[in-house]
């Protein structure tokens, strides 16, 4: 009876909710991704208590929760009931800083007590990873200096265990609160973000919370699996797109040294992006006074929940919500409340009048030369890509162009791939197969179809081929050089082994027969006919078995990828699709014809691309090898070539 009962709703994708206890109204809440807590003490009975939650799909919050993802309604994070003693620790902020010498920790505990506080005491015990006590004594509000501290970073994610003990006036223990903290110093120095005095480069990824069976209701297994993938592929940073994640994820990032941009649950792109055009006449929240308290409250909820996590280096005001006085107020709140972290927001690129919102220049999908142009302008702010390498379908090419900027420009401080995991749901298709379904696969219209399939892993967690590039380019330069050297040595050894084996093969002179319509080549166990009129080899027999159906032709088209279609590439390169059909044959030329080697060239014109041509060169060797070279004389005046192949 001396306890106060509270109900914590971990999170409800609610946009809006009402709570009742035993038929009595308790409270109301919005914001789908930060906890809502209610005091149930006045409403509970000894037994037979009933708690009801009414969740609404539509509310005013819908305007600012317009993230690109599947829409669900209901409870998707833990719900719990807990009791608090009459006097308890209502809030804890263990401000763990680091002095310039990088060995002296500066711990400033800020506590808030609730209840009858007369005569109570709070003590702190801090131990290192080996369990050795660094401090044991009262909490006075003063900063505690600690010698021999190991700084927290990606390479050394050292955490210290704090234990706060609250006793009442009679000396009876009321609460013991454990917490793991990391000592680090994150700051802007001469326009460069530095951690513990060293420039930091984010080899990052955006991460939605997702499971193909459970949607956003992920669990510890999902998070541990994701963390293992990040560590195995040299990813050192995560942006929580576009809402705060479950608290366990922050614990894992603390333990594994993963840097975090912690993002407020705010996105309103539908209020100012009109079919790709920018039209902010009724942007929400913008500078509308009725929205200011709402968005600042979301920033406050996130900060108060996550402020003790060493992994959180940067607060983000949200995503794709244009700019205005309301988001500026969020930044002002972050700066005033927590000077130890920086503030991020990309949307000011569309409205430079509010450039003060962000401490860094953040852009999405900027091209390498655009980034270079910014960095050459001697900017005040460093540059990051909050989204890049849009990994939709078969993609992620060109990552090297971005990663190498980090070596050239100290103010280029990395980026966050879009994104970690495809958002898709297991379902049974019309053929009775269990497959991953995307937008439109569930009968809904209108839809964005597979636009949620942007991950470097599939929805079931399997790595995509693109992950090989991520792992390579996110490795350190030294590790890349070592891998390149090992690959080169292995390739050279293989070449030597194959060459020796090939040279040891007995050769048999080729027999060449020139006819009016064909050129014949005969070896020990094979024979080949090149057709002058047929524009290539008409027959290839090995041990009497025919291997050709018809003469190969040069091909210039391939299936377009998702990102091809997104940037209009198929339309720009459509002439090459026609070239596949309408290529013209311009004749055959025998370049060499002897007992050791026969080399034949076939020439082709490409009428749909004026001035373009191609050739196929076939080389037959006495050892029995056939080599085919497809040659396209490159001209940068031609349209982009999708591919060249047979």
Which residues make up each language-model segment?
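Substrate-binding/catalytic cleft of secreted carbohydrate-active enzymes
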Residues: 227-230, 237-460, 465, 469
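Secreted/periplasmic carbohydrate-active enzymes, especially glycoside hydrolases
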Residues: 1, 7-260, 298, 313-314, ...
């Amino acid at each position: 009876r001396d306890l106060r009962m509270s109900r914590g709703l971990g999170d409800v994708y609610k946009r809006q909710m009402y709570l009742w206890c035993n038929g009595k109204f308790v409270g109301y809440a919005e914001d789908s991704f930060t906890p809502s807590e209610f005091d149930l003490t006045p409403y509970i009975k000894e037994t037979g208590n009933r708690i009801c939650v009414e969740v609404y799909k539509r509310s005013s919050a819908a305007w600012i929760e317009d993230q690109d993802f599947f829409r669900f309604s209901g409870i998707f994070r833990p719900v719990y009931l807990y009791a608090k003693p009459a006097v308890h620790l209502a809030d804890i902020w263990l401000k763990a800083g680091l002095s310039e010498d990088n060995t002296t920790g500066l711990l400033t505990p800020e506590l808030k007590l609730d209840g009858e506080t007369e005569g109570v005491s709070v003590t702190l015990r801090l131990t290192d990873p080996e369990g050795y006590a660094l401090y044991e004594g009262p909490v006075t509000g003063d900063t505690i200096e600690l010698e021999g501290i190991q700084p927290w970073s990606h390479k050394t994610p050292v955490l210290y265990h704090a234990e706060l003990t609250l006793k009442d006036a009679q000396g009876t223990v009321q609460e013991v609160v454990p917490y793991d903290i990391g000592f680090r110093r994150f700051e802007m120095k001469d326009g460069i973000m530095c951690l513990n005095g060293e420039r930091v480069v984010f080899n990052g990824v955006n991460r939605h919370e997702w499971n193909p069976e459970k949607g956003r209701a992920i669990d510890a297994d999902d998070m541990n699996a994701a963390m293992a993938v990040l560590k195995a592929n040299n990813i050192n940073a995560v942006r929580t797109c576009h809402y705060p994640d479950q608290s366990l994820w922050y614990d894992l990032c603390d333990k594994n040294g993963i840097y975090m941009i912690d993002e407020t649950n705010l996105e309103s792109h539908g209020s100012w992006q009109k079919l790709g055009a920018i039209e902010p006449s009724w942007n929400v929240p913008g500078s509308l006074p009725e929205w200011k308290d709402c968005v600042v409250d979301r920033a406050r909820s996130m900060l108060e929940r996550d402020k003790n996590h060493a992994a959180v280096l940067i607060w983000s005001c949200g995503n794709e919500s244009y700019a205005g006085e309301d988001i500026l107020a969020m930044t002002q709140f972050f700066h005033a409340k927590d000077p130890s972290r920086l503030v991020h927001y990309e949307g000011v690129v569309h409205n430079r009048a509010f450039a003060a919102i962000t401490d860094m220049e953040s852009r999405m999908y900027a091209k390498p030369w655009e980034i270079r142009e910014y960095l050459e302008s001697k900017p005040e702010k460093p540059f990051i890509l909050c989204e890049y390498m849009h990994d939709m379908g078969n993609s992620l090419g060109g990552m090297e162009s971005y990663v190498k900027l980090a070596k050239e420009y100290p103010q280029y401080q990395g980026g966050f791939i879009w994104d970690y995991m495809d958002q898709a749901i297991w379902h049974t298709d019309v053929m009775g197969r269990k497959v991953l379904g995307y937008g439109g696969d569930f009968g809904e219209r209108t839809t964005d179809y597979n636009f949620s399939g942007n991950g470097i892993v599939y929805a079931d967690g399997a790595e995509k081929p693109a992950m090989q590039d991520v792992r390579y380019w996110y490795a350190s330069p030294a590790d890349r050089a070592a891998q390149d050297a090992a690959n080169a040595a292995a390739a050279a050894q293989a070449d030597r082994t194959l060459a020796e084996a090939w040279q040891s093969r007995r050769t048999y002179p080729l027999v060449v027969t020139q006819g009016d319509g064909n050129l014949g080549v005969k070896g020990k166990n094979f024979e080949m006919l090149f057709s002058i009129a047929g524009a290539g080899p008409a027959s290839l027999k090995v041990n009497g078995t025919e291997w050709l159906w018809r003469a190969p032709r040069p091909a210039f088209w391939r299936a377009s990828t998702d990102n091809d279609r997104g940037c209009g590439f198929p339309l720009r390169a459509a002439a090459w699709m026609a070239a596949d059909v309408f290529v013209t044959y311009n004749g055959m030329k025998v370049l060499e014809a002897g007992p050791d080697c026969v080399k034949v060239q076939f020439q082709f014109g490409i009428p749909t691309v004026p001035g373009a041509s191609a050739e196929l060169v076939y080389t037959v060797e006495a050892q029995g090898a056939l080599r085919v070279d497809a040659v396209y004389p490159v001209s940068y005046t031609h349209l982009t070539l999708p591919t060249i192949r047979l």
